[in-house]
């Protein structure tokens, strides 16, 4: 989903800052709900994602980038924002953080046993990463996710044992 319109000129500005090949095409990516994401087709045949952070301030995005790099440095495969010519990993444009990310050509995670087992292995690897400074103890994606889930469960009578466990963990 796109909340911020991105022109070919906007995309070219970011690509130029990263020293990347010229832009051939740009199209919105489906599936997001809090940011604007676009697939960029480059002249050398490669593809990148241009992400405009609509729900976080540039300062929050900078912190998120630091955490993402920390996780990657500790061996967890995760798309790290590309470094721009000035060493930064984002560009602030019209008060919003803009970045380029590697495009991962893959679908959504399947719900079969092998896929879920693979997910569990990656989650275990993630949990083995030492905690870095500044890591938040709350989780949100443009809103307070857990609190909203609990309110919804109350309103709809949709509590499950897993949600109750999350609720207990969230008040610790």
Short names for language-model regions:
Residues 1-3, 28-35, 51-52:
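Short acidic/polar alpha-helix capping motifs at helix-coil junctions
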Residues 33, 89-90, 144-145:
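Short secondary-structure boundary/hinge segments and terminal tails
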Residues 110-170:
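A cross-family kinase active-site recognition segment
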Residues 43-136:
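ATP-binding pocket architecture of kinase catalytic cores
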Residues 7-11, 33-36, 64:
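Short N-terminal amphipathic alpha-helix/helix-capping patch enriched in small hydrophobics
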Residues 20-41:
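ATP-binding glycine-rich phosphate-binding loop
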Residues 1-22:
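Juxta-kinase regulatory segment immediately upstream of eukaryotic protein kinase catalytic domains
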Residues 28, 84, 139:
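Residue-level "edge-of-site" marker
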């Amino acid at each position: 989903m796109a909340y911020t319109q991105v022109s070919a000129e906007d995309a070219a500005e970011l690509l130029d800052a990263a020293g990347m090949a010229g832009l051939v095409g740009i199209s919105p990516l489906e599936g997001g709900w809090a940011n604007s994401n676009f697939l960029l087709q480059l002249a050398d045949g490669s593809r990148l994602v241009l992400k405009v952070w609509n729900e976080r301030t540039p300062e929050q995005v900078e912190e998120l980038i630091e955490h993402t790099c920390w996780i990657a440095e500790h061996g967890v495969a995760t798309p790290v924002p590309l470094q721009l010519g000035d060493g930064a990993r984002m560009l602030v444009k019209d008060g919003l953080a803009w970045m380029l990310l590697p495009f991962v050509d893959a679908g959504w995670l399947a719900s079969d046993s092998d896929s879920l087992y693979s997910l569990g292995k990656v989650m275990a690897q993630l949990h083995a990463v030492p905690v870095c400074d500044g890591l938040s103890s709350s989780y949100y994606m443009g809103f307070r996710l857990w609190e909203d889930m609990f309110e919804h469960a109350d309103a709809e009578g949709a509590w499950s044992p897993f949600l109750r466990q999350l609720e207990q963990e969230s008040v610790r």
